[in-house]
Each structure stands twice: as structure tokens, then as C-alpha cells.
């Protein structure tokens, strides 16, 4: 699994970097399977992955935010977000990724996950019960220090006012616009928590956004719960959405819940 996920990420990065200067990444081609517009850069990245799956006859179904579910009559599914942080990419903000995960039916049974920062090439990877790495070096979450806390939070048109309450609970707060990489920063011990509370269900997190990074977080010692404090599990279904709190140290919950 490791080798094929790394190959996919490398091919996506090559394809994304080969787009000509001045190429309109924001061009909306059609409505994706998840109900959001598919931009040119999303399509280029997705096509590279789908081509690899078909050429190598990989033993996976595919779930992607652009094309939806491709039933190849396999027991496992490759869950992909070809470009997570599309708007960052389109606007020239250097913080976006490709997210790749392999599992059977839901977040709970994801076996392997890879998130690559397509700007820097930094690659986060995890396999179930084998730990998490950044560029092949082990990573782990950090102990919570309320006097040095940094929280990540979703802020935008559909965010709940509760997100602003959450942001004030940390010494610093940031909103970076790429869920998979933000979750990985938490796994790496750079921040203490990551929070999303959307007022509109359809704008909450999708499983394709976080299938890989949730495994990376858990293997680094962190956890993710829904806003009722239940361990988050999401089916491999583009229609299912959720809000969440992710954290590196259980002590965070004493401050924010």
C-alpha cells in the first residue's frame, strides 16, 4: 500500500506542477459528485490517479469528491481528494494537498493513509497500528500547554458563531483552508486542536477530506470526536458530513468542551 500511495502522490504533484503558467485553475468544469464545482486542477489530479488504478488493475474501488464512487467489485476502497485546498491552489496560496486512503467501509477501518503537501512535497503517512511519519520520520502529537496553545478552526461563510468562541480559547488561532494538512499539523505536534462547526450540514467535513489524515492523527497519538464527544466515524459516502473536534492531548477537552 505504501508504495502505490507514494507513487500516486508523486504523479499528482508532477501533473499539478506541469500546468502551464497562467493556466486558469479556477475554471469550473462541472458539478462534482459531492455537489461542489470541479475545477480544472481537480480534474487533472483525479485523472492521474484513476489512470493508475486502471492501468495497474489495482484491487480497489474508488471514492473521489469529483467522480463519486467507482464500483470495481473489490472489497477495499481508495478514498481520494485529488486536491484538498482547491481554493488555496487557485489563488496561489501555498497550502494544498493530495489525500489518499485505503479502507473498507468507513473511517474506522482505514488501513493506510497518505497526505502530501503539493507545494513542499512533505509527505505524511500512516498504516494502522504502525505509527505515523513525516518524510519517513516518526511524528507524534504534543502535550497540551494552555499557555502556549495554538488552535486551528474553520472560519468562513458557513461557520457557526461557536467557531469564534473556540478560537478565543487558545493563545493563538489559525484558519488555513486545507483540512487534510491542518489535521497533519496536529499529528505533527505543531498545534493542539482543530475544530469545525458548520451551520449548514452540506458544508461540513466530508470523508474524502479527512480519511487519510484521521488515521495519521490517531497513529500519532491524537483523537477526533463529533460535537457530542463520540469518536468520529463516517461511512465512505459523499452525502455524509460531520462537524468535529480533533486534538492531540485529552487535556484539550477540559478547555474547549
What are these regions (language model features)?
Residues 29-30, 37-41, 91, 174-176, ...:
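Short Gly/Pro-enriched turn/cap motifs at secondary-structure boundaries
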Residues 64-66, 116, 154:
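Short His-Asn-centered micro-motif
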Residues 12, 129, 141-257:
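An extended, acidic
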Residues 49, 53, 98, 102, ...:
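Buried hydrophobic packing segments
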Residues 42, 53, 86, 117, ...:
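Residue-level signal for inorganic ion chemistry
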Residues 74-129, 147:
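DPxDG-like acidic metal-binding loop motif
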Residues 1-83:
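N-terminal subdomain of lithium-sensitive/metallo-dependent phosphomonoesterases centered on the IMPase/IPPase/PAP
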Amino acid at each position: 500500500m505504501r508504495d502505490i500511495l507514494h507513487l500516486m502522490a508523486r504523479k499528482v504533484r508532477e501533473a499539478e506542477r506541469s500546468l502551464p503558467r497562467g493556466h486558469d485553475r479556477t475554471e469550473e468544469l462541472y458539478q462534482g459528485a459531492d455537489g461542489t464545482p470541479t475545477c480544472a486542477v481537480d480534474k487533472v489530479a483525479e485523472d492521474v490517479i484513476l489512470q493508475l488504478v486502471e492501468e495497474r488493475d489495482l484491487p480497489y474501488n474508488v471514492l473521489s469528491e469529483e467522480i463519486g464512487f467507482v464500483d470495481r467489485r473489490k472489497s477495499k476502497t481508495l478514498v481520494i481528494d485529488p486536491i484538498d485546498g482547491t481554493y488555496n491552489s487557485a489563488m496561489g496560496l501555498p497550502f494544498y494537498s493530495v489525500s489518499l486512503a485505503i479502507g473498507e467501509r468507513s473511517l474506522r477501518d482505514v488501513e493506510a493513509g497518505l497526505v502530501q503537501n503539493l507545494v513542499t512535497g512533505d509527505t505524511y503517512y500512516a498504516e494502522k497500528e504502525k505509527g505515523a511519519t513525516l518524510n519517513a520520520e516518526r511524528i507524534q502529537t504534543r502535550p497540551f500547554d494552555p499557555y502556549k496553545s495554538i488552535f486551528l478552526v474553520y472560519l468562513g461563510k458557513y461557520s457557526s458563531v461557536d467557531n469564534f468562541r473556540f478560537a478565543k480559547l487558545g493563545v493563538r488561532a489559525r484558519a488555513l483552508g486545507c483540512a487534510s494538512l491542518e489535521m497533519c499539523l496536529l499529528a505533527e505536534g505543531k498545534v493542539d486542536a482543530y475544530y469545525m462547526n458548520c451551520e449548514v450540514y452540506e458544508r461540513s467535513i466530508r470523508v474524502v477530506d479527512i480519511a487519510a489524515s484521521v488515521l495519521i492523527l490517531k497513529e500519532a497519538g491524537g483523537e477526533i470526536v463529533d460535537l457530542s464527544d463520540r469518536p468520529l466515524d463516517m461511512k465512505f459516502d459523499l452525502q455524509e458530513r460531520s462537524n468535529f473536534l480533533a486534538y492531540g492531548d485529552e487535556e484539550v477537552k477540559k478547555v474547549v468542551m
